[in-house]
């Protein structure tokens, strides 16, 4: 598995999906090189709205649902099936009461990621935006991870 560091976590890539804090890494690369391995064209387009949530901000399941025209519960289902956690930042989606909600890597990892990105005031998210569709996926991906 090829791995890269993003703030407090290691992200692993097995050729089809990413893993947060994988147990074994055969090779470590820089984050920019890691991103070049991923074919974003194969990703569910509804997940690309995640790239419209800037670093340091969060959105809620409800706001995300409004943009997609679906329910917050469906958004939770969609986030749970994100094949690229951290890369497509589903950790930036929180509950309407600003509690963190769930995360593939666990709530503590979600909290560490949000703190690393400057999205927390104390223990709670403090800057909320409505997700938006982006034009240039690659550019948004690099900006989302602080590489541009």
UniProtKB/Swiss-Prot annotation:
One term under GO cellular component: cytoplasm
Top-level taxonomic group: Archaea
Reaction(s) catalysed (UniProt annotation): a 6-O-methyl-2'-deoxyguanosine in DNA + L-cysteinyl-[protein] = S-methyl-L-cysteinyl-[protein] + a 2'-deoxyguanosine in DNA; a 4-O-methyl-thymidine in DNA + L-cysteinyl-[protein] = a thymidine in DNA + S-methyl-L-cysteinyl-[protein]
Cellular location(s): Cytoplasm
Protein's UniProt keywords contain Magnesium: no
Any single GO BP term: methylation
Pfam family, one: DNA_binding_1
Entry keywords, A to Z: Cytoplasm, DNA damage, DNA repair, Methyltransferase, Transferase
MF GO annotations: methylated-DNA-[protein]-cysteine S-methyltransferase activity
EC number, UniProt record: 2.1.1.63
Catalytic residues in the record: 90 (nucleophile)
Annotated function: Involved in the cellular defense against the biological effects of O6-methylguanine (O6-MeG) and O4-methylthymine (O4-MeT) in DNA. Repairs the methylated nucleobase in DNA by stoichiometrically transferring the methyl group to a cysteine residue in the enzyme. This is a suicide reaction: the enzyme is irreversibly inactivated.
Family: Belongs to the MGMT family.
More info: This enzyme catalyzes only one turnover and therefore is not strictly catalytic. According to one definition, an enzyme is a biocatalyst that acts repeatedly and over many reaction cycles.
Protein's name in the database: Methylated-DNA--protein-cysteine methyltransferase
Protein source organism: Pyrobaculum aerophilum (strain ATCC 51768 / DSM 7523 / JCM 9630 / CIP 104966 / NBRC 100827 / IM2)
Gene name, Swiss-Prot/TrEMBL: ogt
